[in-house]
């Protein structure tokens, strides 16, 4: 089974992707994390991608498509996965469908208010060791400065997150992705979750969609 999580930055896709992936025993692929890893390398591709990210612009389709294609060729994804953050527009969706040639896809769209998105994105950070996501407003570690999962005390605050860049990313996202939502609505496998809810409520709604006990 392939599950696609669609939604703007800060909608909660990454948090839910990790939790649901464990429940259905499928890998969670966070496309944003893939590109952040590439950016850390000393290559011309990394520099090019980083320029788009800093401006709040979407990375060109031809770059995204090829990176995802190479990534998904790994044998560990042959039985399915949760794909978080891709495709983001019609061109990417059609490329993806032609590449995978599998009919069993479920698309879940995270619908959330812009004001809440901005607050979530500005407040989020993660454990540098295990990747557990936290938020200064909504989800702090149980013990201050100690990760709940791995007990690390080293955290990563994303440098590309500031209010103006986030607003631009949301605007660009809507322009690019709303036509994709209309496209998927007619697929018969498109679902909407209210991502204004709290983390547990969103997880419960996704479990119902995927029929997880």
Swiss-Prot record:
Higher taxonomy: Bacteria, Pseudomonadati, Pseudomonadota, Alphaproteobacteria, Rickettsiales
Amino acids binding ATP: 10-15, 124, 133-134, 197
Similarity comment: Belongs to the adenylate kinase family.
Signal peptide: none
Pathway as given in its UniProt record: Purine metabolism; AMP biosynthesis via salvage pathway; AMP from ADP: step 1/1
Protein name per Swiss-Prot or TrEMBL: Adenylate kinase
Segments of this protein annotated with the region NMP: 30-59
Binding residues annotated for AMP, in chain numbering: 36, 57-59, 85-88, 92, 158, 169
Pfam family, one: ADK
UniProt region (LID), positions on chain: 123-161
MF terms in GO: adenylate kinase activity; ATP binding; zinc ion binding
Chain sites annotated for binding Zn(2+): 127, 130, 147, 150
Job description of the protein: Catalyzes the reversible transfer of the terminal phosphate group between ATP and AMP. Plays an important role in cellular energy homeostasis and in adenine nucleotide metabolism.
GO cellular-component term (any): cytoplasm
Subcellular location, record wording: Cytoplasm
SUPFAM superfamilies according to UniProt: P-loop containing nucleoside triphosphate hydrolases
Subunit structure: Monomer.
Catalytic activity: AMP + ATP = 2 ADP
Enzyme Commission code(s) on record: 2.7.4.3
Keywords: ATP-binding, Cytoplasm, Kinase, Metal-binding, Nucleotide biosynthesis, Nucleotide-binding, Transferase, Zinc
GO biological process, one term: AMP salvage
Free-text note regarding domains: Consists of three domains, a large central CORE domain and two small peripheral domains, NMPbind and LID, which undergo movements during catalysis. The LID domain closes over the site of phosphoryl transfer upon ATP binding. Assembling and dissambling the active center during each catalytic cycle provides an effective means to prevent ATP hydrolysis. Some bacteria have evolved a zinc-coordinating structure that stabilizes the LID domain.
